[in-house]
Amino acid sequence: LARIIKDAPNIEVVVKANHTGTSKHRYFGMGKSHVRKTHPYYAGMEIKDMEPYPEPIVRFDWRNPFWEPDTHKMLADEVMCDAQADYYIDVKEARKTAAMTFSVLSDFLAEKDIVIYDLCLFISEDGKTVYGEISPDCGRYRHYDLGSLDKDVWRAGGSSDQVLEKWNLLYKMITQ
């Protein structure tokens, strides 16, 4: 099943199951905070670095170019509030699609002892179609015994060969 995505939104949809990546590095002190006491399900639960959130969350990022064209300053994608993201993508539908995709992939990978910490998706403007790749470059995948199977190998100082080795290992694990 395939279709051409016309006018793809400049939005990356991120599903976060663990307090890692952007959330860990940008939100000072969040890694030692607690869920509000009046929360109906998770009152007082501690948020810890590298640990699971009470449940996966979906957020929307504006995709910046890697370099600012005039100043050549390195840019990062920026987190958007739902109301702003909804100008470009059907947030309600995209949230459902992202959560369903994450759930299906999590169930599949759990059979291989792999946990998804987070996943970045490209979803159509109507919020109903995931397009583009789902790869080790757009998520954080951890094996119970083998550790990181994604781009964090490189971020931790690993060589290109080590990254390819982990990615090939992930490929073998999910195709056999």
Where are these regions (language model features)?
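Acidic/polar, glycine-anchored loop/turn motif associated with catalytic or activation segments
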Residues: 1-118, 125-176
